[in-house]
Amino acid sequence: IIKKLKSHKGENLIPYNSNWKVNWKRRYKNPYSDLEKFIFNSKKEVVEIGGSVRSYNQVMGQYMGILKFSSRVSKKLFEFYKTLPKDEKMKISMTDFLQKFTNETKFKFKTLKMNYDWHEVDTFNDFKVAKKYLKN
């Protein structure tokens, strides 16, 4: 995944798991549990990221927690972060931060589709699920 991301010519990318639904059903009895919005437009630009989901139509993929930014955009992100109130800095998730940055600066992040067997591990149960399905 990292090799594909590094070799991609795009500078400001948010890779996503296109096979998210299979893994979500393995992790949760209720697939809407812990699911977040991930919506992009026809130009493959992120429109919405993070936040509660009401239907699967709001999930075009799963944010993988991996990002690729140019040094110029990294500086912009850091400067934007410094403007947030201290209490918000301590609580904000990455998806909420990226959405807030996008909303307030009108910056567009591009998406990069990944078709790998990606497993998010937040809990011990997630670890057991990943271990069961990942090949050595």
Where are these regions (language model features)?
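Short, well-ordered alpha-helical microsegments
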Residues: I1-I2, T95
